[in-house]
């Protein structure tokens, strides 16, 4: 419904039109302006009414073409948007010349130059008509009035193709900028807090590490002190062990085949020893393990040999020294083999591919070299007696001989005046034999020569027992030792072997032969003699020695109870009656006093006699003579019984002495062969 007095309506393309869109066509020329009188100010619509009118116009867009605002107005078109500017007559910048024609388009700064105080009399209406070349042909129109400060949006039909223009004021921009600033501030605050937290964590960790480093430094200082104290203590114990080691080496040197048996009986080292090594080890006399000048640097092993047909070295040394990395590096002296005795030549001849001890000794690249050296140093050399007695050797030979003697002799006999009661004697002797057997087994099994190297409390018991056993073996075979009758007995209940220095008077053995009850006193004394001499003979069986005469000479037999002096012919041992206490006292005084006493009691001849006793030849000789001893004991028993019957009628003091004296003589003859009866 076009009106002639109104401007030309905006051409709006229809949606159903099939004509192509003309995007590049120029806009149509503006319609001619008509002069219309302005209504008075009282009749002019208020901003609220203008807003309502604009809303009504917006609702009418879907019915017909959009109508321009009432005249006068100014058309501005740019970028496909046509704007109609309607000014009131009283508004500043109103030119009355515009009423007659199009006039000039107001500048774009008009809206900015109009103060709010001058708008109270009139209003400015701005209409936007969007002419977008879209296929849907939808337009967006928004009318803003200076009287209304809020954004006003013209809402058209609810379609997907609808275009909406939103005009925001400065308050929204300010709020958005404030929100952005707040977000940035919160983000900076959060970053600052995270940075401060990281710094605090780093400082806390640094303080913890400093405390840990200080504690570790203190611990290192304590470790250094402990290491120095340990080295001092180790040197001290080495000095304490030295006299015992020298004494042990002296004894071992006179035992043939000691080290070869010890090496072969060791389960770990015997793997390296072949038949040729066994032949070479028969010439081995001593093994020593010594620490270097500084204990922490390492140690060395020395093997001493006799003259042998295999090599010319008398001593071969293998040294283990720690390098800077703490690993043991070995060096050894070259072995000067005789021609044709080298290990390589022997292996080619015998086709023996097994390991050899001397190959290990000369080779320094074997991975198990350090382990074998540690076994020799910490196990074999510390206690070689244990491995020597494990299979074969002194202990097994003694047990074998003792078992044979037990099988041959079911009971033991002793010469007593009332010997006609054989059943009573059998019961007594069986009890005594069981007691002595238990005591002998307990004490012999406790002998460990080298245990003193590991504990200091073991010195006072084990070493003294071994000393007593060695002295007994030496003194029993000494040719200068006079053999006589003894009416005093030795109390051997607390020692391993019989010691001639432990002779003391027994109150039960004191016989004056002056009373009528001499027969009963002799019976009691003979019982005591039986017990003590039974222990002596059992120990003699274990050591294969002849110790039939344990008492003093006839000159010292005065029957005094207070006689505390020694009963041996050796004048050096007449200082006391208890050799065990004296040895302990010597040990407490120092190694020098102990060595001095040792030199006075032992000599080279004694050790040579001991070797003869321990050797296997002596064991075989004893087996051959055991039967002769049993026959001799029976013959002597018959002779003494006949002799006693002939002399029984004599009733004087001399006759009593003559009747008692043959009894020890029979004991002495039996004890030489290690047999009781």
Swiss-Prot record:
Induction context: By TGFB1 or serum in pituitary cell lines (at protein level).
Glycyl lysine isopeptide (Lys-Gly) (interchain with G-Cter in SUMO2) cross-link site: 11, 158, 160
Biased composition (Polar residues): 484-493, 526-540
Modified residues (Phosphothreonine): 333
Residue span of region Disordered: 1-54, 175-202, 469-658
SUPFAM superfamilies: NAP-like
Gene3D superfamilies documented for this protein: 1.20.5.1500, Nucleosome assembly protein
InterPro entries, per the entry: NAP-like_sf, NAP_family
Biased composition (Basic residues): 178-193
Main location per the UniProt record: nucleus
Keywords: Cell cycle, Chromatin regulator, Cytoplasm, Isopeptide bond, Nucleus, Phosphoprotein, Transcription, Transcription regulation, Ubl conjugation
Keyword Cytoplasm listed: yes
Amino acid composition bias (Basic and acidic residues), ranges on this chain: 509-525, 639-650
Pfam family, one: NAP
Subcellular locations according to the entry: Nucleus; Cytoplasm
Description of post-translational modifications: Phosphorylation at Thr-333 impairs function on cell proliferation.
Superkingdom, taxonomy of origin: Eukaryota
Pro residues composition bias: residue spans: 25-44
Subunit: Interacts with histones. Interacts with CASK. Part of a complex containing CASK, TBR1 and TSPYL2.
Miscellaneous comment: Synaptic activity down-regulates TSPYL2 protein levels by inducing rapid proteasomal degradation. Subject to X inactivation.
Function of the molecule: Part of the CASK/TBR1/TSPYL2 transcriptional complex which modulates gene expression in response to neuronal synaptic activity, probably by facilitating nucleosome assembly. May inhibit cell proliferation by inducing p53-dependent CDKN1A expression.
Protein name: Testis-specific Y-encoded-like protein 2
UniProt source species: Mus musculus
Gene: Tspyl2
């Amino acid at each position: 419904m076009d009106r002639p007095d109104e401007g030309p309506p905006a051409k709006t393309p229809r949606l159903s039109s099939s004509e192509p869109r003309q995007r590049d066509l120029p806009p149509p020329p503006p319609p001619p302006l008509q002069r219309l009188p302005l209504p008075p100010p009282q009749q002019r619509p208020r901003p609220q009414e203008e807003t309502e009118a604009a809303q009504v116009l917006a609702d009418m867009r879907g019915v017909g073409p959009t109508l321009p605002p009432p005249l006068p107005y100014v058309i501005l078109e740019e970028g496909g948007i046509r704007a109609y500017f309607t000014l009131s007559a009283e508004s500043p910048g109103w030119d009355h010349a515009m009423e007659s024609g199009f006039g000039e388009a107001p500048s774009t700064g008009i809206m900015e130059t109009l103060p709010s105080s001058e708008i109270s009399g009139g209003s400015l209406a701005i209409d936007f008509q969007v002419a977008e070349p879209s296929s849907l042909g939808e337009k967006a129109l928004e009318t803003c009035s200076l009287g209304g400060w809020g954004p006003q949006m013209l809402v058209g039909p609810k379609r997907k193709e609808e275009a909406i223009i939103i005009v925001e004021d400065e308050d929204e921009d300010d709020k958005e900028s404030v929100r952005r600033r707040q977000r940035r501030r919160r983000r900076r605050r959060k970053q600052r807090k995270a940075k401060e937290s990281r710094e605090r964590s780093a400082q806390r960790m640094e303080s913890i590490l400093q405390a840990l480093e200080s504690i570790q430094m203190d611990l290192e200082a304590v470790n250094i002190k402990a290491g120095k104290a340990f080295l001092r203590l180790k040197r001290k114990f080495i000095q304490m062990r030295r006299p015992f080691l020298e004494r042990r080496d002296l004894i071992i040197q006179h035992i043939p085949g000691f080290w070869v048996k010890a090496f072969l009986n060791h389960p770990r080292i015997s793997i390296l020893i072949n038949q040729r090594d066994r032949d070479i080890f028969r010439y081995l006399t001593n093994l020593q393990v010594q620490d270097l000048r500084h204990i922490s640097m390492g140690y060395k092993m020395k093997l001493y040999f006799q003259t042998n047909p295999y090599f010319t070295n008398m001593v071969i040394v293998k040294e283990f020294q720690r390098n800077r990395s703490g690993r043991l590096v070995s060096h050894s002296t070259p072995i000067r083999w005789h021609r044709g005795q080298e290990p390589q030549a022997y292996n080619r001849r015998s086709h023996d591919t097994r390991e050899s001890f001397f190959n290990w000794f000369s080779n320094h690249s074997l991975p198990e070299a350090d382990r074998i050296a540690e076994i020799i140093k910490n196990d074999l050399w510390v206690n070689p007696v244990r491995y020597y007695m494990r299979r074969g050797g002194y202990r097994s030979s003694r047990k074998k001989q003792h078992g044979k003697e037990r099988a041959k002799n079911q009971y033991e006999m002793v010469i007593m005046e009332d010997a006609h009661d054989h059943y009573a004697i059998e019961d007594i002797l069986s009890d005594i034999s069981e007691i002595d057997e238990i005591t002998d087994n307990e004490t012999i099994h406790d002998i460990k020569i080298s245990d003193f190297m590991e504990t200091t409390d073991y010195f006072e018991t084990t070493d003294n027992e071994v000393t007593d056993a060695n002295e007994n073996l030496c003194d029993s075979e000494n040719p200068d030792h006079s053999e006589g009758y003894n009416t005093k007995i030795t109390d051997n209940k607390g020692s391993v072997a019989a010691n001639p220095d432990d002779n003391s008077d027994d109150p039960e053995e004191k016989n004056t032969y002056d009373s009528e009850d001499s027969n009963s006193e002799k019976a009691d004394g003979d019982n005591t003699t039986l017990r003590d001499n039974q222990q002596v003979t059992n120990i003699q069986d274990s050591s294969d020695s002849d110790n039939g005469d344990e008492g003093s000479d006839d000159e010292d037999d005065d029957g005094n109870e207070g006689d505390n002096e020694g009963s041996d012919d050796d004048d050096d041992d007449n200082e006391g009656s208890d050799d065990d206490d004296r040895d302990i006292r010597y040990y407490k005084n120092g190694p020098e006093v102990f060595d001095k006493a040792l030199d006075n009691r032992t000599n080279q001849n004694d050790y040579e006699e001991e070797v003869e006793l321990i050797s296997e030849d002596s064991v075989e000789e004893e087996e051959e003579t055991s039967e002769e001893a049993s026959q001799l004991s029976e013959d002597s028993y018959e002779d003494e019984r006949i002799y006693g019957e002939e002399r029984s009628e004599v009733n004087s003091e001399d006759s009593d002495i003559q009747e008692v004296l043959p009894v020890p003589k029979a004991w002495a003859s039996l004890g030489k062969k290690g047999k009781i009866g």
